[in-house]
Regions:
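Gly/Ser/Thr-rich phosphate-binding loop
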Residues: 24-27, 39-151, 164, 248
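Conserved ATP-binding/catalytic segment of the ANL
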Residues: 159-226
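A short helix-loop-beta submotif of the ANL/AMP-binding
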Residues: 1-6, 126-128
Length: 270
């Protein structure tokens, strides 16, 4: 029957649009889900003790069922499954309804580091977040979560079948395959640096492979080196700070300094 395509050109109104349009699929960046997590958590923390206790119990049940079992391709114990169904129809469905996500199907997210804390929350409330990784030079998708295979928090999924991934020097992720660019147009000098001797493309991202899943740690060029020689990965620090409701934007500063600091833009709309 096809699908209805909805385009929102006002980022600050996205949550209002969701409650109005009730999307079943939506592509987004991790920052969107960080905002959702912050808003829901703040509302529940301000609720009465009984409501708060019920909410966090529901989250614990959702986490155990959806992450410890479903994400690992394991069947939940009968008692857990029955408890989840009750919790899902009562507490978790109310949370999703407040978000406008009564019938969540698939919600791809990519473009930045996804905090495991946020990813855990999204799966716990019953939303199928599919984390992926891609580049302009890779015709978008390099890897993504597969519903029929184990999914680990913090990973960017498994490489798609036509892509070869290897880890090079400085733990750089290197790619090769039919969807990877053959080179930049009329940029011979750049192309000589962009590919290794075996034809693998240098992504500039650091990471590692574990049990078939790809994990990213940092953009190599973004790594800071403090004055005492220690390397700092700013994105991981920033993702931890961005789950605070009082912070809108943050930039970690550490290069050639004795300490790590951060430039913070407060959330003035509270």
């Amino acid at each position: 029957e096809g699908a209805e395509l909805i385009i929102n050109t006002y980022p600050h109104e996205i949550q209002e649009s969701m409650r109005e349009m009730h999307p079943t699929c939506m592509c987004s960046v991790p920052r969107f889900w960080e905002k959702v997590y912050i808003a829901v958590k703040a509302k529940m923390d301000d609720a009465g003790s009984v409501q708060k206790k019920l909410f966090y119990h529901a989250l614990a049940v959702g986490k155990k069922r959806n992450i410890e079992y479903i994400a690992n391709c394991m069947r939940p114990p009968l008692a857990l499954e029955l408890e989840y169904r009750i919790i899902n129809k009562t507490v978790l469905s109310m949370v999703r309804k407040q978000l406008g996500l009564e019938k969540p199907n698939i919600f791809p997210t990519a473009g930045a580091y996804v905090s495991p804390e946020v990813e855990e929350f999204v799966h716990a409330i019953g939303i199928n977040m599919v984390v992926g990784y891609g580049l302009t030079e890779s015709l978008a998708t390099v890897s993504c979560d597969h519903s029929d295979k184990k999914r680990s928090l913090g990973s960017v999924g498994r490489p798609i079948s036509c892509i070869q991934v290897k880890i090079g020097e400085d733990n750089e992720v290197l790619l090769k395959g039919p969807t990877i660019t053959p080179g930049y147009y009329h940029r011979d000098t750049t192309n000589a640096k962009a590919f290794d001797k075996d034809g693998f493309f240098h992504t500039g991202d650091a990471g590692y492979l574990k049990d078939g899943e790809l994990f990213l740690t940092e953009r190599i060029k973004d790594l800071f080196k403090t004055s005492n020689g220690k390397y700092i990965a700013p994105q991981q620090v920033e993702s931890l700070l961005l789950v605070d409701k009082f912070i809108d934007q943050v930039a970690v500063i550490a290069d050639q300094r004795k300490f790590v600091s951060a430039l913070v833009v407060p959330e003035f709309r509270l």
